Amino acid sequence: MMHFKSGLELTELQNMTVPEDDNISNDSNDFTEVENGQINSKFISDRESRRSLTNSHLEKKKCDEYIPGTTSLGMSVFNLSNAIMGSGILGLAFALANTGILLFLVLLTSVTLLSIYSINLLLICSKETGCMVYEKLGEQVFGTTGKFVIFGATSLQNTGAMLSYLFIVKNELPSAIKFLMGKEETFSAWYVDGRVLVVIVTFGIILPLCLLKNLGYLGYTSGFSLSCMVFFLIVVIYKKFQIPCIVPELNSTISANSTNADTCTPKYVTLNSKTVYALPTIAFAFVCHPSVLPIYSELKDRSQKKMQMVSNISFFAMFVMYFLTAIFGYLTFYDNVQSDLLHKYQGKDDILILTVRLAVIVAVILTVPVLFFTVRSSLFELAKKTKFNLCRHTVVTCILLVVINLLVISIPSMKDIFGVVGVTSANMLIFILPSSLYLKITDQDGDKGTQRIWAALFLGLGVLFSLVSIPLVIYDWACSSSSDEGH
């Protein structure tokens, strides 16, 4: 994906200047619903999030505290697309293989539309409270508990993304090194062991970058990451017409024709023990919510309607890209596809695959520090240790990287990362938090009865998603072995 949702989250959430009186839109459309200069909301009382809408106050804010956005609609679409795109794209073909084409299309379409709706709820909450940062919005509505919950959800999502990126390094770097050495894929040595390589990369490259006081150019790696994934999509489509369907070895009781027909025929609806990972993987692929409000705050002539248009365009573009990657990846390998689609492409003399593999590896290595910076900053914020201290900065960085490496080494498959993060933090950020915030903010508004019913149903859907998916994922772990994918 690659998601690289990271660049925006970090540069915007951590380095963006947010005015004390959170943003007053310079688009007059934001104030058409207001009469007599007031909003009937108990959340307006706090000065840090208040928007007094009298003309004189608006003029004052423009002069001293209000900072208008400067980013065009097109660039905002690009930024939000960067925020959506991540490593989840590598797992979508596996999700399709375990649901079938029709069921996958229904799930992908549903999550896309529901994600757009959740962003609409988030924008309404931002407009009502004036908050332009997700964590501050949670604190404004639910107090310290809300702040902690949102910090926890975003940190878990970013940690899951880091795990998936380092898992890509663990999976793909050995193949790239073997190719450059002219060795077969079966070649074995300590210097092509993914577990060793991920530790070397982490402490040789990622650690020094994570120790930097600020990100600098790393905040702009998301554009490179998105380019890498567009390149990956092109290669996936191209390889579909180059790689023949792989037929497993036959035993004496099965004929070649029947096996080939069964293996190389697309399935439209499939249900098995791995189907449970489909929805969490798709949800993981669409999480971008912590970046929405910072992008909104930077949008030129911003309004809720304009930001919703940015959201609609970005999600539609990612929907097309995700579906193409999933369908062409599936039609190349059918039931043999793995949860890391890129790892399935092997070829001793295939320069094109080597190129895309190296591009993705470089992209994820440069993206991990961006996500790491956000997680570490969140921890320091929660601990109220925001003043820079080199010793604490170094110790916390090393401890977090050691823990992350231990998890990456022990995790058998990328689907496990998608499954856990998808049913927990992704579900919280897409379904539960936006609907909960909206219901709390509008609990005194009798004019929004219908909208509140839809938001309540949306919240119930998120809770149901958790209650069903979490036990099924745990059950699959208990019943399955990592040998299912040959890792």
Swiss-Prot record:
InterPro entries: AA_transpt_TM
Record text on activity regulation: Inhibited by alpha-(methylamino)isobutyric acid (MeAIB). Inhibited by lithium, potassium, choline ions, N-methylglucamine. The pH dependence has an allosteric effect on the transport.
GO CC aspect terms: plasma membrane
Post-translational events: N-glycosylation plays an important role in the L-glutamine transport.
Keyword entries, A-Z: Amino-acid transport, Cell membrane, Disulfide bond, Glycoprotein, Ion transport, Membrane, Phosphoprotein, Sodium, Sodium transport, Symport, Transmembrane, Transmembrane helix, Transport
Predominant localisation class: membrane
Glycan-bearing residues: N251, N257
Cytoplasmic topology ranges: 1-74, 134-147, 212-216, 297-312, 372-393, 438-452
Cystine crosslinks: C245-C264
GO MF assignments: alanine:sodium symporter activity; amino acid:sodium symporter activity; glycine:sodium symporter activity; L-glutamine transmembrane transporter activity; neutral L-amino acid:sodium symporter activity; proline:sodium symporter activity
Sequence intervals crossing the membrane: 75-97, 113-133, 148-168, 189-211, 217-237, 276-296, 313-333, 351-371, 394-414, 417-437, 453-473
NAD found in the keyword field: no
Protein role: Symporter that cotransports short-chain neutral amino acids and sodium ions from the extraccellular to the intracellular side of the cell membrane. The transport is elctrogenic, pH dependent and driven by the Na(+) electrochemical gradient. Participates in the astroglia-derived glutamine transport into GABAergic interneurons for neurotransmitter GABA de novo synthesis. May also contributes to amino acid transport in placental trophoblast. Regulates synaptic plasticity.
Listed name of the protein: Sodium-coupled neutral amino acid symporter 1
